[in-house]
Swiss-Prot record:
Keywords recorded for this protein, A-Z: Ribonucleoprotein, Ribosomal protein
Function: Involved in the binding of tRNA to the ribosomes.
InterPro entries (alphabetical): Ribosomal_uS10, Ribosomal_uS10_CS, Ribosomal_uS10_dom, Ribosomal_uS10_dom_sf
Family stated for the protein in its record: Belongs to the universal ribosomal protein uS10 family.
SUBUNIT field: Part of the 30S ribosomal subunit.
Lineage: superkingdom: Bacteria
Protein name stated in the entry: Small ribosomal subunit protein uS10
GO biological process: one example: translation
GO CC terms, sorted: ribonucleoprotein complex; ribosome
PANTHER family named in the record: 30S RIBOSOMAL PROTEIN S10 FAMILY MEMBER
Amino acid sequence: MATIQQQKIRIRLKAFDRRLLDTSCEKIVDTANRTGATAIGPIPLPTKRRIYCLLRSPHVDKDSREHFETRTHRRIVDIYQPSSKTIDALMKLDLPAGVDIEVKL
């Protein structure tokens, strides 16, 4: 039996700012829907928390410490049935500098 392979573009987005990430996802989904492709997402992935522990004083006081954290928010957007218009529109899309984008065809 021959199975029909469906074309799919998977876009992974990462950012420290959740609102910036959500607006970028909205732009991608709107662009895909405008060009006739089907967009599924944004699908939220687990947020990674990275905690850094530093000594407050430069000398002996080991009991006094300060904690800092960074949170990396992640989303996935799947685009099914992309046309050449969809790919061109996604390449021309202007997204903020704080969002890391990874595209798989």
